[in-house]
Amino acid sequence: MAVVIDGKQVAASYRETLKERVAELRARGIVPKLKVVLIGDDPASHSYVRGKERAAEEIGIDSQVLRFDETISEKELLDLIDLMNADEEVHGILVQLPLPKHIDESRVIMRISPEKDVDGFHPENVGKMMLGLDTLLPCTPHGILHLAKTQTEIAGKHVVVVGRSQIVGKPVGMLFLNESATVTYCHSKTADLGEMTRQADILIVAVGRAGLVTSDMVKPGALVIDVGVNRVEGRLVGDVDYEAVKEKASAITPVPGGVGPMTITMLMHNTVEVASRG
């Protein structure tokens, strides 16, 4: 029976250290400030942003959500980003994705100053991460790495990543490679997925397909991190057959309550990092 990794508990512990750092910054007259841009009325986006607001308030970060109708033009959004880039009191800028179809997401991401890119999506920050340089790391991959470190040593382990998205799959493999793991990527064109996943000491699944990974695809004693979030018959489930796989793995993250809390916590970490540099 696997250890169930309580992402809420791990995140709460990490936020305590962030609270201390924020208190020290405030004592020096520095108030970490995060600006979040929310466009449209997507329920999931509104839920994520509420979670970010609560976390910021708990830690002592001054957060402000700027809400706009989905009719906002790309130029108006880019002009707003320019203003926030120029505002020395703003440490972190986050534009909640997805954006309306008439707005180019990549152009928006690239417009945010790399120094204030607390999502860790700007190509400059991604490039630094690839090179193993100090930078603002993407929040979900960073959270996954932290969760894994609470369970095992990373160096020398075989990490198999299922999924190759720009937000999770690609960067998380690179973070583990930077920690001296051996990393294998799998995706929709992988010939025999089960053959690959059974080799994993650490299996990270980030596809968005409920029940993709079954117990016969997991090596006994593996650490399994499930990043998928899928709604099935009114409840949230991951990409892993949780009930079956937890009988075989050494540790596993649940959905919900696993990776999600760490994503928001690492966003707070990045905001504090930027404020500390100033």
UniProtKB/Swiss-Prot annotation:
The enzyme's E.C. designation: 1.5.1.5, 3.5.4.9
Single annotated GO MF: methylenetetrahydrofolate dehydrogenase (NADP+) activity
InterPro entries membership: Aminoacid_DH-like_N_sf, NAD(P)-bd_dom_sf, THF_DH/CycHdrlase, THF_DH/CycHdrlase_cat_dom, THF_DH/CycHdrlase_CS, THF_DH/CycHdrlase_NAD-bd_dom
Swiss-Prot/TrEMBL catalytic activity: (6R)-5,10-methylene-5,6,7,8-tetrahydrofolate + NADP(+) = (6R)-5,10-methenyltetrahydrofolate + NADPH; (6R)-5,10-methenyltetrahydrofolate + H2O = (6R)-10-formyltetrahydrofolate + H(+)
UniProt entry tagged with the keyword Zinc-finger: no
Pathway(s) the chain acts in: One-carbon metabolism; tetrahydrofolate interconversion
GO cellular component: cytosol
A Pfam family annotated for this UniProt entry: THF_DHG_CYH_C
Alphabetical GO biological process terms: L-histidine biosynthetic process; methionine biosynthetic process; purine nucleotide biosynthetic process; tetrahydrofolate interconversion
Keywords for the protein's UniProt record, in alphabetical order: Amino-acid biosynthesis, Histidine biosynthesis, Hydrolase, Methionine biosynthesis, Multifunctional enzyme, NADP, One-carbon metabolism, Oxidoreductase, Purine biosynthesis
Job of this protein: Catalyzes the oxidation of 5,10-methylenetetrahydrofolate to 5,10-methenyltetrahydrofolate and then the hydrolysis of 5,10-methenyltetrahydrofolate to 10-formyltetrahydrofolate.
Family: Belongs to the tetrahydrofolate dehydrogenase/cyclohydrolase family.
Subunit field text: Homodimer.
NCBIfam families: PRK14186.1
Name used for this protein in its record: Bifunctional protein FolD
